[in-house]
């Protein structure tokens, strides 16, 4: 159609008849006509009469629908409607032309055609409707707007009002420009025409988008989906429960049927009390032995909301109560604990079925569910509510070492820590059966693992291992690259065990438990998570170099413990290789852990675990006291002692006697000559005389072990009560002149204390005093170099006072420094590094 046409609208119909087809659309059956994208020639203006228009219109209709061909009712209806539509289009064009000519504007005309109902989906995606060109100025583009009708209805949309034709053209051009600018070629559905006939709206004008949506369905967008609560959900569609690789949620998470190979005791299997869901305790509740009372720091992994809920002190036994016997602890009410625990390191753990004292099943569950809700308890709770609120405000005054002890007490409940260290620590295995399936449920779950895999970048081998143990062969089947959920769950469905090596990096609740326990043990507390499918075993029998606490979270798992193969393996300093079953004697412990149970065994204990036929297993292994033996201390101490003795004693610098080589050595080991005996005796006396470590040397060696802890430790979890008192809650601003305005000011009247009991260590190295601290450590193990700051020798006394006065607050003016300005400077430097906490918030 000519771009510069200014005649009446009659020429528009003439151009439709004489001009080239604009698109490859149309309802006529037959081979497709390829779309001609070449520039169209200008048609000369022509003057026609209305009669000629009607004749040409009939020709066009007959061309589209051949009268001689056999036509069904749908084709006849479409032909009739198309004829009516084109007739109305001609009339509308005539009126638009006369109106536009009077105003000096060029008319706009649009035409559409419907697609055949029998067209295929691929043809529908590629079809575009023929449209007449608009009479625009020479500077406008001649690109045509495409409009695809829905194949679900034979009706033709009503004609748009002529007065809004130009606005409609502008809107469509904007849509095309936006579509071209979108790199993903995604567009919103076109706005519904108010004048169009009711029915399904038009299909997408981009056939590629239409095909993509048809093929991909709901999985076009695969990024994590955020729910109403803000938590991410896996976008993958899980299979049905019958075929899903994840185990189905059982009605009872803690089946109490005894294991066939390891029958349970009456104490363990008779009481089947219902375990209440662990409630979340209020943040202001004080003296709760766990992170729920303290809360999770908003600044540390705020995206993961896996904070645990730990019990109140009312649910834990008194410090003077008796502990159950060694080997197995089952807190069944109404039984006595008269049996004495075995303390022999080589003796087999006692299998007596003794249990802890308890008044009822409800009191047994108190450690997991918090205070009971009986009427007397409610009265007592209401009466002490005001007192609890007052105490919660002073929670920042607690001792971090005692808080770590309370976490250990929560894990071992009803066993008291003192009894545990006296009877079991490094001596014997200890099993706690509490029949509370939800006891550790908030630490880890399938949902947390799935969310962790989606949200974070975990790598196989670095963060996750896929293992199997079949027919005596242990294999690690780690793929390369990132551990995405489909790959992990596919391996799990194939019967492989999944080991997560550093879950505390990603789960705030588990990290909080580890960070609090490390204050008590003064060593790195590691955590591994093991997910094992039913009737599977992931690891061969072996022993480790750590004190292990196994926390059964879900399912059941049968554990077998064996005596060390060699006496030198007891309290091993390094982990072993894999043992064959034939190398092991009969197990000294063969029991099934159920959800909520705990098993402790010392380092060097050979162990293996397997799931039952119809039960999966999810458990956490907390590892403590790795490389914390006297041997590690002496490895640091004796080189230091020898170096100092050589510098001080000339006798150690003298040369060896000439006859040493003829009397000492492997070849002379059987000799008992006098020269040999004199040489051996002289060396032994020299060691006893010159290589006795001094107090200062022992202190320096211990500082080196403590320095290693500062490098390995997890960063502390900053609680809300602590945040407002530390640099982590500080915010700075600028004034009108651009000067920085801090919201804190430490004076000599400010009361301060250390953030944690073991937050820093004063170490003398190469004649320099350094403060090593772990507050800035990464969540990954030793990702960065150790953090330290150097201080002057005159400032060491101030650090010592802060260490000795903990957990009490002291005024900055009390620090033993020569001037008030120096005291303020030292306190400010420590506070700005996150090592100090003020008694009162600055805000």
UniProtKB/Swiss-Prot annotation:
Q: Which positions does the record annotate as the modified residue Phosphoserine?
A: 336
| The protein's name in its UniProt record | Bifunctional lysine-specific demethylase and histidyl-hydroxylase NO66
Q: Which UniProt keywords apply?
A: Chromatin regulator, Dioxygenase, Iron, Metal-binding, Nucleus, Oxidoreductase, Phosphoprotein, Repressor, Transcription, Transcription regulation
Instruction: List residues of the JmjC domain.
Output: 502-641
Enzyme kind, highest EC tier: oxidoreductase
User: Which GO terms label this protein's molecular function in UniProt?
Assistant: 2-oxoglutarate-dependent dioxygenase activity; histone H3K36 demethylase activity; histone H3K36me/H3K36me2 demethylase activity; histone H3K4me/H3K4me2/H3K4me3 demethylase activity; iron ion binding
Q: Which family does it belong to?
A: Belongs to the ROX family. NO66 subfamily.
- Please list the residue ranges that the record marks as compositionally biased, kind Low complexity: 44-56, 95-117, 129-139, 180-197, 258-276, 336-358, 365-376
Q: What does this protein do?
A: Oxygenase that can act as both a histone lysine demethylase and a ribosomal histidine hydroxylase. Specifically demethylates 'Lys-4' (H3K4me) and 'Lys-36' (H3K36me) of histone H3, thereby playing a central role in histone code.
Q: What detail does the entry give on cofactor binding?
A: Binds 1 Fe(2+) ion per subunit.
The record's region (Disordered) falls at 1-299, 311-397
Q: For this chain's UniProt record, which GO biological process terms are given?
A: negative regulation of DNA-templated transcription
Where Fe cation is bound, by residue? 542, 544, 607
- Enzyme Commission number(s) of this protein: 1.14.11.-, 1.14.11.27
Indicate yes or no for the key word Ribonucleoprotein: no
Superkingdom field: Eukaryota
Where are the compositionally biased (Basic and acidic residues) regions? 167-179, 378-397
Q: What is its main location?
A: nucleus
Recorded GO cellular component terms are: nucleolus; nucleus
Q: Which InterPro entries match?
A: JmjC_dom, NO66-like, RIOX1/NO66-like_C_WH
Phosphothreonine, modified sites: 222, 335
Cellular compartments annotated: Nucleus
């Amino acid at each position: 159609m000519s771009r510069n046409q200014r005649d009446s609208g009659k020429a528009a119909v003439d151009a439709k008849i004489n001009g080239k087809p604009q698109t490859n659309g149309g309802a006529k059956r037959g081979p497709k006509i390829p779309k001609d994208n070449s520039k169209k020639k200008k048609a000369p203006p022509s003057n026609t009469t209305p009669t000629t228009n009607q004749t040409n219109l009939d020709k066009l209709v007959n061309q589209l629908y051949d009268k001689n061909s056999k036509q069904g009712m749908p084709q006849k209806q479409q032909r009739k409607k198309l004829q009516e539509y084109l007739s109305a289009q001609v009339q509308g064009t005539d009126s638009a032309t006369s109106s536009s000519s009077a105003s000096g504007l060029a008319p706009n005309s649009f035409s559409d055609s419907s697609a055949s109902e029998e067209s295929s989906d691929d043809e529908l995606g590629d079809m575009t409707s023929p449209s007449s060109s608009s009479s625009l100025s020479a500077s406008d583009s001649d690109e045509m707007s495409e409009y695809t009708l829905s194949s679900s209805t034979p009706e033709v949309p009503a004609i748009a009002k002529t007065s809004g034709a130009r606005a409609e053209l502008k809107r469509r051009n904007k849509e095309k420009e936006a579509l071209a600018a979108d790199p993903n070629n995604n567009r919103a559905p076109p706005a519904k025409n108010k004048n169009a006939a009711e029915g399904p709206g038009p299909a997408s004008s981009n056939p590629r988008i239409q095909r993509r949506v048809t093929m991909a369905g709901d999985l076009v967008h695969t990024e994590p989906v955020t729910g109403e609560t803000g938590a991410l959900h896996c976008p993958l569609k899980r299979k049905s429960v019958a075929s899903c690789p994840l185990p189905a949620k059982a009605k009872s998470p803690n089946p109490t049927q005894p294991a066939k190979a390891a029958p349970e005791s009456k104490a363990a299997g008779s009481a089947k009390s219902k375990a209440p869901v662990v409630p979340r305790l209020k943040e202001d509740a004080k003296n709760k032995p766990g992170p729920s009372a303290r809360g999770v720091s908003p600044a540390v992994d705020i995206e993961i909301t896996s904070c645990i809920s730990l019990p109140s002190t009312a649910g834990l036994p008194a410090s003077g109560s008796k502990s159950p016997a060694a080997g197995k602890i089952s807190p069944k009410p109404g039984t006595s604990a008269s049996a004495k625990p075995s303390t022999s390191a080589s003796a087999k753990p006692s299998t007596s079925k003794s249990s802890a004292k308890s008044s009822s099943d409800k009191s047994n569950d108190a450690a997991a569910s918090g205070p009971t809700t009986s009427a007397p308890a409610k009265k007592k709770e209401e009466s002490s509510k005001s007192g609890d609120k007052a105490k919660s405000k002073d929670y920042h005054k607690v001792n971090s070492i005692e808080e770590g002890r309370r976490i250990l007490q929560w894990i071992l409940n009803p066993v008291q820590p003192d009894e545990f260290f006296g009877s079991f620590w490094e001596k014997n295995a200890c099993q706690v059966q509490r029949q509370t399936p939800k006891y550790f449920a908030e630490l880890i779950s399938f949902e947390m693992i799935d969310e962790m895999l989606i949200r974070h970048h975990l790598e196989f081998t670095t963060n996750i291992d896929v293992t199997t143990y079949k027919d005596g062969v242990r294999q690690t089947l780690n793929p390369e690259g990132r551990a995405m959920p489909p790959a992990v769950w596919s391996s799990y469905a194939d019967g492989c065990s999944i080991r997560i090596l550093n879950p505390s990096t990603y789960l705030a609740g588990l990290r909080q438990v580890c960070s609090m326990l490390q204050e008590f043990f003064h060593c790195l507390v590691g955590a591994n998570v093991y997910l094992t499918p039913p009737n599977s075993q992931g690891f061969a029998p072996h022993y480790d170099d750590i004190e292990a606490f196994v926390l059964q979270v879900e399912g059941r798992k049968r554990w077998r413990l064996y005596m060390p193969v060699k006496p030198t393996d007891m309290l091993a300093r390094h982990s072993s290789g894999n043992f064959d079953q034939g190398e092991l004697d009969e197990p000294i412990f063969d029991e099934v852990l159920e959800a909520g149970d705990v098993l402790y065994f010392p380092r060097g204990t050979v162990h293996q675990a397997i799931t039952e036929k119809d039960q999966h297993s999810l458990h956490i292994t907390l590892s403590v006291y790795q490389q914390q033996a006297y041997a590690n201390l002496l490895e640091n101490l004796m080189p230091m002692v020898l170096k100092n003795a050589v510098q001080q004693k000339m006798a150690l610098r003298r040369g060896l006697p000439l006859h040493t080589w003829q009397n000492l050595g492997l070849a002379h080991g059987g000799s008992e000559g006098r020269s040999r005996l004199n040489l051996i005796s002289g060396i032994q006396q020299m060691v006893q005389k010159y290589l006795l470590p001094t107090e200062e040397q022992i202190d320096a060696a211990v500082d080196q072990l403590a320095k290693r802890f500062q490098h390995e430790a997890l960063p502390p979890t900053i609680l809300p009560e602590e945040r407002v008192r530390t640099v982590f809650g500080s915010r700075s601003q600028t004034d009108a002149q651009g000067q920085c305005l801090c919201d804190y000011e430490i004076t000599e009247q400010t009361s301060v204390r250390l953030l944690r009991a073991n937050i820093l260590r004063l170490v003398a190295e190469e004649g320099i005093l350094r403060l090593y601290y772990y507050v800035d450590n990464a969540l990954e193990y030793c990702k960065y170099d150790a953090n330290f700051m150097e201080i002057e020798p005159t400032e060491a006394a101030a650090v010592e006072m802060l260490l000795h006065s903990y957990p009490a607050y002291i005024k900055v003016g009390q620090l033993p420094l020569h001037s008030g300005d120096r005291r303020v400077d030292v306190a400010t430097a420590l506070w700005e590094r996150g090592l100090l906490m003020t008694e009162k918030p600055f805000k």
